[in-house]
Amino acid sequence: LFSISSLRNKIIAVVGVLVFLGLLIQSGTNLWIGKRHALDELGQQTRALARSHSESIATWIAARQSVVRSFSSAADASDPVPMLAQAKIAGGVDTAYIGFPDKRIFFSDKQDLPAGYDPTARPWYQMAATTSGVALTAPYVDAASKKLVITFANAIKDGSSLKAVAGLDVFMDGIVSN
């Protein structure tokens, strides 16, 4: 019926096909497992990096909040400029200042403000005056430099009476470069 050589060829062909299918299945499984492992590893590294950046940002914000809270005694100083200059250095910020309800304002550095500048009309002042704790503004255009800036502002109170609002400005271009 079947010659040995023909049966032998059929067995070799069947075994060859089975070996090929086994290798194909094994390769596909290895590829799928490798891809899944690589994606899992990438996800873990991405989450770790995001967590690290989040912690760094939280630490950076907390440091500036601490600095803006720390110079509340500047509200009682006859010349608050030296305290403001020190706060600017300590906070690593672009400008430190303190605004009073009578519309006086003192800065760590000389500012080129528009005529009639009223700190009490500024969003940072109003936000801090109505917030317990340190207020952090959304980016806005700074009145003196015309650059985008964020402000950390803290109301300085005597009981329930507002004495002043202390602020720290950080220019957005500095934040972006870091």
Annotated model-derived regions:
Residues 2-36:
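Extreme N-terminal signal-anchor transmembrane helix of membrane signaling/transducer proteins, especially
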Residues 12-17, 52-54, 148, 153-154:
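An N-terminal domain-start capping segment
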Residues 44-139, 175:
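Extracytoplasmic/periplasmic sensory segments of membrane signal-transduction proteins
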Residues 141-143:
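PAS-family sensory domains
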Residues 145-178:
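Conserved beta-strands of PAS-like sensory domains
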